[in-house]
């Protein structure tokens, strides 16, 4: 179980902003054990963890996740892509960067 309150604190956002980042309706946050919410938060954690391994810094990874547009994906951020269900594509992009591709 991932606590939306604790996770939003780590991300530096209000709990309601977590709804937007996860791509779930804000009312879903009233049921923090919601399968969909938990799945989305797990996807976010996977992507942020992979980015942290690449950068060596969790804060840089969180900043990248929320703010840096990815040219290969129409200049959308990792957060936007994950919210829209494309976590696997972002993870593949990070793997490409690890293998020497340029972002």
PLM region spans:
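Non-transmembrane "mature" sequence context
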Residues: 1-103
